[in-house]
A protein has these predicted regions:
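A contiguous loop/helix-start segment that scaffolds small-molecule binding in enzyme catalytic cores
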Residues: 32-33, 112, 119-238
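RNA substrate-binding interface of SAM-dependent RNA methyltransferases
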Residues: 1-8, 77-81, 87, 95-96, ...
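General beta-strand structural signal in soluble alpha/beta enzymes
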Residues: 65-68, 115, 141
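Short amphipathic alpha-helix with an adjacent loop that forms part of the alpha/beta core around
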Residues: 21-29, 105, 162-166
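Class I S-adenosyl-L-methionine
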Residues: 1-66, 74
Length: 238
């Protein structure tokens, strides 16, 4: 009212976030822009919004975070991960063994964790994450947050090297690694498995899971886990 801004408002809270996410996706499909705001705290960090952000990103829409108290909080708000808290670690230091031990400790903590990295060391960190992070953990890589060339990408460890080949290191990085996923009873239908199996040899796991999620309506993580499991079983047989 103070700035005479007129727009349609609707509430999103812990009891209706699924419906709220669907409404947001409907508006985006119509070519509209949507702002997720709170009267206190940061959306998807201190307040509800994780489901909305995750669904919007899964459907290929861009999420632009408003500058927060720090780069870590800003990155988490745009990552669309679970809101149960996170561990900020910053830069991994020390030699190869010390870094590997510290990274494994973070992975085993059961919490989302945040790393910082400089461009000239990014390739080294990508190597370490590719080797250590389980294939079903989402990794969000953000660079140049709140600046002109801001970039936020979410992927999984098997796709990190391919991502790096298309994104030469530039700017300062915030890396958010998801916690271990809870077990789920959702499984793909036999029909979906059949056509996904046909495409597994032709497309990277991340790209295929993104496409299949839009077609089948199953979460990308479930499809990605199926693809990785299928590839591993085929490798064992071979």
């Amino acid at each position: 009212e103070k700035f005479n801004i007129e727009s349609h408002l609707f509430p999103v809270h812990q009891h209706n976030e699924h419906e709220g996410a669907e409404k947001v996706l409907t508006y985006l499909a119509e070519g509209k822009r949507v702002a997720l705001v709170t009267d206190a705290g940061t959306p998807a960090v201190s307040d509800p919004g994780t489901k909305v952000v995750a669904d919007v990103r899964e459907h290929g829409y861009r999420v632009i975070p408003i500058p927060g108290a720090s780069a870590s909080v800003t990155a988490v708000s745009a990552a669309g991960m679970a809101p149960e808290g996170f561990t900020f670690h910053g830069f991994l230091n020390g030699g190869k063994k010390e870094r590997a031990a510290e990274l494994q400790k973070l992975i085993n903590s059961g919490r989302i964790f945040i790393l910082y990295e400089a461009p000239h060391r990014l390739e080294k960190l990508i190597d370490e994450l590719s080797e250590a992070v389980p294939a079903d953990r989402k990794i969000t890589i953000a660079r140049e947050l709140t600046k002109k060339f801001e970039q936020i990408d979410s992927l999984y460890s098997p796709d990190l090297h391919e991502w790096l080949s298309h994104n030469p290191p530039k700017g300062e990085y915030v890396i958010v690694v998801d916690a271990a996923s809870a077990s789920t009873e959702e499984t793909l239908t036999e029909e979906d498995r059949q056509w996904i199996d046909e495409l597994i040899p032709l497309l990277p796991a991340g790209q295929l899971s993104s496409i299949a999620s839009k077609i089948s309506r199953f979460p990308k993580k479930i499809i990605y886990n199926y693809i990785v499991s299928k590839k591993n079983s085929q490798a064992t047989v071979d």
